Amino acid sequence: MNLNKIIDSDSVGFPYQSINKYTCNINEFLYEETSLKNNHKNLLLIIDPQNDFMEDGSLPVKGARNDMLNLISFIHNNLKKIDKIKVSLDTHSYTQIFYQSWWQDSDGNHPDYYSIIKSDSKFKPLFHKKQSELYVKHLNKMNKDLVIWPYHCILGTYGHNIEPNLENMLSYFSLVTKKKVEKITKGSNPLSEMYGIFREEYSNLKLSSTLSAAYGHYENIIVAGEAKSHCVLESIKQLCEFYQFDNFNSNILVLEDCTTSIQGYEEKTDIEFKMLSSKYNVILTDSKKIVL
């Protein structure tokens, strides 16, 4: 089916009209293709493609609109070659450890957005004091920072939703291939950030061989989404931990034209990806060049 019957390319990444504009095409979708066999070859893992990460969102990633356009085209062009799609959704409430509401100084001020909370910070937790202070100490020991982010991806808000044109494409994929798109929520624990989809920032959780097997039977795990510097990078780092198990030998293909770093993190992120690609089967590629 022509792409313009599935999405409105001019509105990608912008506040958008009701889904009803495209429901008239659903019956056409249903009869366009027959069910396609799942060969367990290609898994598309889309990280946090949500409205709040678009350029007009509350935590904007400059370049996210083009990322979504490229990703939509990639799915459309490879409809018969993608065996499974999983989508993660950053899912928060207003009172979490990485938001202003959690911290206050002696004068009653909250930290600014993008502030870094250290163990010796003048800002003190208003909730779960002991656990919060331990969390910051553990992060600092791991050379990680607790960043105060703008409020984003609050459950029930427009910002939490998948970018609508991508959601149209996911619906199209599901209807014509008869394959369910799996949606995974992450990040609801108020006491920890959760960038990667498998484990929180500070956690005693060990990734298991059972979980490894759920991903390892795919030849290729294709990764896209936002933001490259945080949730995409950490998800790939956690995926790389699966290589310790005999049942995981997948290629991890990163679509670099379908993911963008938060501004200011680009150089550090590129260095980390180069390190991962030199050590593991992490392949940095492009949605227009990749052959499945």
Give the ranges of each region predicted by the language model:
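Active-site-adjacent betaalpha module
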Residues: 1-45, 49-87, 92-292
